[in-house]
Amino acid sequence: MSLPSELQRPVGFDRLYGLEIDLATPEEMRARVQVTDDHLQPFGLVHGGLFASIAESITSMGSWLGVRDEGKSAQGLSNQTSFLRPLLGGTVHATARRRHRGRTTQVWEVDITDDQDRLCALVRMTIAVRDAP
């Protein structure tokens, strides 16, 4: 599956932390980030903000894929991240699935896992759907 041209190379903040998109559809997104020392908090664990950032980016992208042809844009409205297991290194894997598509909002759930497919965080994202600028 080929990615839409807008998602083939990360830009801005996504490029800064190393986001790589593996699957992009309006219903499901998959991505990963190779952990570096820049992703760690002072105690050697992957910073929770990385998990939240990945979730917000990929759910906004997936939502946008479903509304762009309607002249709409998509951006994070609410990000609720539950941290379940520390991640020390390797790769952060994220799988996002759309749970609700409304006229002005979408709700997504994101599983954040490690290289052993162990669940490290659960994220629930609410995405605002607005007229494109």
Regions found by a protein language model. Give the residues of each.
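Terminal targeting signals and extreme-terminal segments of soluble enzymes
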Residues: 1-133
